[in-house]
Amino acid sequence: MALQGTKRSYEQMETGGERQNATEIRASVGRMVGGIGRFYIQMCTELKLSDYEGRLIQNSITIERMVLSAFDERRNRYLEENPSAGKDPKKTGGPIYKRREGKWVRELILYDKEEIRRIWRQANNGEDATAGLTHLMIWHSNLNDATYQRTRALVRTGMDPRMCSLMQGSTLPRRSGAAGAAVKGIGTMVMELIRMIKRGINDRNFWRGDNGRKTRIAYERMCNILKGKFQTAAQRAMMDQVRESRNPGNAEIEDLIFLARSALILRGSVAHKSCLPACVYGLAVASGYDFEREGYSLVGIDPFRLLQNSQVFSLIRSNENPAHKSQLVWMACHSAAFEDLRVSSFIRGTRVIPRGQLSTRGVQIASNENMETIDSSTLELRSRYWAIRTRSGGNTNQHRASAGQISVQPTFSVQRNLPFERATIMAAFTGNTEGRTSDMRTEIIRMMENAKPEDVSFQGRGVFELSDEKATNPIVPSFDMSNEGSYFFGDNAEEYDN
């Protein structure tokens, strides 16, 4: 991946590395996922899981959550200082599903966090391997993005539920570092900032004293991350205003909501990475694949190829459709919750349908669900083609303003138009153009009005056959221009609740 200026590629962010060349990046990303795989194999041994049980995505998620919880310093400290009934701050665990007499049974397991940390470090050459932990967080975040709608969270912060395409990474923990920041959508950053400003309005001491100084630094850092995602000068200038405000308040909230709306057409750059469940890396390592030697990339053919050759199972409730469950997990694996369904369908080779039409609930099974009626099936995670993941937002004409559709943040670098309802979006921009940001607002609105829904993004970019690992022959799909495809339209998905 070409590095421009001081920008680090996301493989570098992912591995915490300094500037490296492509081969070094591939090796360090390989080392990271290889470590995850080795850890997973060791955990399966500890838990005495059969091969089949080890391929169960629900078991994978429990094991991933255990290691994330074992390394969550802040929460561990909090739990030790505020002991709550029935929670041992030194232990972590969750449901593990095993096959007994032709039925699935749930076993609740409990482990010392210290022990989990030891196994993780041992799998990662004695290091803490924070990059691997972040990678697991991003996989969980991508799964949440595909499974839940954030309508309630959007409404609470004064944003419009139709802006859900800006909400990538909204469930990522704060501690997810640079790699986490890279995959957060515009709406996610705006929401974090608005929450912060609201606290400042309600709590006089929020910006004051020693703590307030730290808060202020965090605020400015978040503003800079958001500014870096915008691609037009006017949007960036508005972010400078928000950042430099002496005492952030309602004016800043207004500006941020304005900017979030503008991002529906003047899209920001948001990174996309294919982060797979730990069991997939475990399967590959167990079969003798050496990730570090072979190298690995999160944004190229590698994850597609890995999924072509992995068999993963999932528990299925009696009223769920296994094909729909597969679609959900496929989207999560490729970070494609906010991609145009026309593009996803083309790459996957089977029709990808909107969330509201899926007969499936989330992947995880609640502790009060009856296991008697639960069966398992194979997840179909293979694809017909592969495509390069993008971080550009797909704006046409030299990364300037372009067409966007309420509800798409492109994942794949594939030529298409990005249809949008200009009337719907522009309706939100009547009113306030006075105040210190008036000229920037006027400029942003002008750019949005000039955007054309039929403009083509990612000119000349196509998908590739799975045999074409060097990406030499792009196949440029032709899409029905009038027919947009957004995943959350007309939707009744469950809400995400912490």
Curated annotation (Swiss-Prot):
Keyword Mitochondrion attributed: no
UniProt similarity note: Belongs to the influenza viruses nucleoprotein family.
UniProt-recorded Gene Ontology molecular function terms: RNA binding; structural molecule activity
Protein name in the entry: Nucleoprotein
One record GO biological process: viral penetration into host nucleus
GO cellular component: helical viral capsid; host cell; host cell nucleus; ribonucleoprotein complex; viral nucleocapsid
Protein task: Encapsidates the negative strand viral RNA, protecting it from nucleases. The encapsidated genomic RNA is termed the ribonucleoprotein (RNP) and serves as template for transcription and replication. The RNP needs to be localized in the host nucleus to start an infectious cycle, but is too large to diffuse through the nuclear pore complex. NP comprises at least 2 nuclear localization signals that are responsible for the active RNP import into the nucleus through cellular importin alpha/beta pathway.
Keyword terms, alphabetized: Capsid protein, Helical capsid protein, Host nucleus, Host-virus interaction, Ribonucleoprotein, RNA-binding, Viral nucleoprotein, Viral penetration into host nucleus, Virion, Virus entry into host cell
Region described as Disordered: spans on this chain: 1-22
PTM section of the record: Late in virus-infected cells, may be cleaved from a 56-kDa protein to a 53-kDa protein by a cellular caspase. This cleavage might be a marker for the onset of apoptosis in infected cells or have a specific function in virus host interaction.
Keyword set includes Ribonucleoprotein: yes
Subunit-level organization: Homomultimerizes to form the nucleocapsid. May bind host exportin-1/XPO1. Binds to viral genomic RNA. Protein-RNA contacts are mediated by a combination of electrostatic interactions between positively charged residues and the phosphate backbone and planar interactions between aromatic side chains and bases.
Residue positions of motif Bipartite nuclear localization signal: 198-216
Motif position, Unconventional nuclear localization signal: 1-18
Protein's cellular compartments: Virion; Host nucleus
Organism: Influenza A virus (strain A/Chicken/Hong Kong/FY150/2001 H5N1 genotype D)
Pfam families reported for this sequence: Flu_NP (PF00506)
Gene: NP
